[in-house]
């Protein structure tokens, strides 16, 4: 079949941490190197209100929907809304669960996150996920000292997906956008506990990703310079200077996967391992 797109939106909806979906989605996407998956991860979706907000996001950026939702009513709602929107969706675990049921001759428990043992480590991961979702993109800037890691960087340097990946390892992570001319929160500059790391990428790569981002929106929503390489180069220059002034380590994510970026962050502070 002819390759239709060089990028696509991949929506991953889970009633647990989302690790299963992330692994499955990336394994599948890796088979199509000419198409780049723009991941949207929605963990801990367990009621209708949460799910309807997710489906609004899917409607705004149509693409492939993968989900692991054991509640049959919610799963049915995903199927229904995806049909209405006109996007494909797959319940990743259902075929596997049905195979187990057939072979073992007994029904499954249909319990969210049943693969996780309810121990201290598990609850730490859930706490980290909640913290990270609450502190995405500069939200709640007053309590940075509760974070283990704070990621700073210009737009589209994978701050959010990297934060969620770290949270899945029990690492409380906040992220802050770097915008030239806009001061960083005062609480970040006085924080003593978190490891603060700057994320950068090449201007060429950021321009490509941002061009994909603005598709379906108006350029004026982001600003005329949002995808301009020269303007992006100035943003990166400012970000490098800011990190250098504050002695924050920098990681170039241009050719790194989310997993590789997270590993590089953890390597900077052994206590996070």
UniProtKB/Swiss-Prot annotation:
E.C. designation(s): 2.7.11.32, 2.7.4.27
The UniProt record lists the keyword Methyltransferase: no
UniProt feature coiled coil, ranges: none
Cross-referenced InterPro entries: Kinase-pyrophosphorylase (IPR005177), PPDK_reg (IPR026565)
Residues holding ADP: 153-160
Keyword Ubl conjugation: no
GO molecular function, one term: protein serine/threonine kinase activity
Catalytic activities: N(tele)-phospho-L-histidyl/L-threonyl-[pyruvate, phosphate dikinase] + ADP = N(tele)-phospho-L-histidyl/O-phospho-L-threonyl-[pyruvate, phosphate dikinase] + AMP + H(+); N(tele)-phospho-L-histidyl/O-phospho-L-threonyl-[pyruvate, phosphate dikinase] + phosphate + H(+) = N(tele)-phospho-L-histidyl/L-threonyl-[pyruvate, phosphate dikinase] + diphosphate
Membrane-spanning ranges: none
Family stated for the protein in its record: Belongs to the pyruvate, phosphate/water dikinase regulatory protein family. PDRP subfamily.
Role summary: Bifunctional serine/threonine kinase and phosphorylase involved in the regulation of the pyruvate, phosphate dikinase (PPDK) by catalyzing its phosphorylation/dephosphorylation.
Designated name of the protein: Putative pyruvate, phosphate dikinase regulatory protein
Organism this protein belongs to: Sinorhizobium medicae (strain WSM419) (Ensifer medicae)
